[in-house]
């Protein structure tokens, strides 16, 4: 059990330090973490998203996300288009596409260089294990809900 605890601690330490690095690059890009996450997703996925898509993918609270979206909208980076009665899709403006490209491409390029420096086997293994951890942890979270 001590070995599992050490692995969990190392995992959490690396996860937290990685989050710190994303925060650091967001600051260097002149962005809040939440604006950076929204812009990153729009850049990476290259299609309109809903607020619920972003909440689900990032874990941001609805309030934090809404605040970031309002700021991006006010700055002319995005517009909200009605999707249905309950949802609006977040769409990049022309100005937003240029700005998001300028801000997010350097970050994505950094990630790509790191991944390109790994062997194909390391990339495959990393994805396999992180996906396996996520799936099993998701089951644990759902099981916890049932115990309450």
Predicted regions located by residue number:
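C-terminal regulatory/oligomerization modules of transcriptional regulators
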Residues: 1, 121-148
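N-terminal positioning helix adjacent to the helix-turn-helix/winged-helix DNA-binding module
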Residues: 7, 34-35, 50, 95, ...
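N-terminal helix-turn-helix DNA-binding core of bacterial DNA-binding proteins
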Residues: 20-64
């Amino acid at each position: 059990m001590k070995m599992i605890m050490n692995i969990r601690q190392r995992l959490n330490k690396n996860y937290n330090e990685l989050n710190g690095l994303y925060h650091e690059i967001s600051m260097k890009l002149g962005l809040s973490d939440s604006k950076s996450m929204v812009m990153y997703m729009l850049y990476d996925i290259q299609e309109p998203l809903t607020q619920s898509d972003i909440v689900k993918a990032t874990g941001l609270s609805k309030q934090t996300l809404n605040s970031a979206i309002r700021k991006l909208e006010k700055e002319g980076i995005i517009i909200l288009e009605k999707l249905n009665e309950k949802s609006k899709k977040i769409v990049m403006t022309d100005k937003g596409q240029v700005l998001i490209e300028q801000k997010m491409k350097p970050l994505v390029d950094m990630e790509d260089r790191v991944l390109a420096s790994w062997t194909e086997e390391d990339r495959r293994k990393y994805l396999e294990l992180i996906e396996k951890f996520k799936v099993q942890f998701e089951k644990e979270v759902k099981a916890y809900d049932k115990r309450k």
